[in-house]
Amino acid sequence: MFFRTSSLFTTIVAFTVMAAAMPGNPKPTTTTVTVTAPAHPTATAPASECKTGPVQCCNSVQSSKSPAASLLLGLLGIVLQGVAVPVGLTCNPITVIGVGGNSCSAQTVCCENNNFSGLIAIGCTPINLSL
């Protein structure tokens, strides 16, 4: 009986020491905050006006507040605080020269932030390739 009581006591002490050694607060997570200018209704611009990178062909362009865009932004850890900006979903760069081979059957846009491997582009403005 003494052996079992001492084993139980030793086990309780061991668990107490291990619990005391573990940190109580987890390490804080880092959140990426992307700040863009608030979206204003804009007219379609000519492709030559895209100064932020290549013209993009996006499957859809939605508000950053839409469920699909919010989900992707959240999964990527991107926070757009207090603004609703147009974002392009599933985008590929296209060249304006030689449009015949690089046509876009979806929406052509010029976006401010295209650094997410085509999954999402932030701050998009519609582009007219025929201008």
UniProtKB/Swiss-Prot annotation:
The keyword Membrane does not apply. Belongs to the fungal hydrophobin family. Self-assembles to form functional amyloid fibrils called rodlets. Self-assembly into fibrillar rodlets occurs spontaneously at hydrophobic:hydrophilic interfaces and the rodlets further associate laterally to form amphipathic monolayers. GO terms for cellular component: extracellular region; fungal-type cell wall. The keyword ATP-binding does not apply. It is found in: Secreted; Secreted, Cell wall. Expressionn is switched off in the fruiting bodies but abundantly expressed in the vegetative mycelium of both monokaryon and dikaryon. Keywords: Cell wall, Disulfide bond, Glycoprotein, Secreted, Signal. CDD domains: hydrophobin_I. Residues 1-21 form the signal peptide. Its main location: secreted. Aerial growth, conidiation, and dispersal of filamentous fungi in the environment rely upon a capability of their secreting small amphipathic proteins called hydrophobins (HPBs) with low sequence identity. Class I can self-assemble into an outermost layer of rodlet bundles on aerial cell surfaces, conferring cellular hydrophobicity that supports fungal growth, development and dispersal; whereas Class II form highly ordered films at water-air interfaces through intermolecular interactions but contribute nothing to the rodlet structure. This is Class I hydrophobin POH2. Disulfide bonds join 50-110, 57-104, 58-91, 111-124. It comes from the Eukaryota. GO terms for molecular function: structural constituent of cell wall.
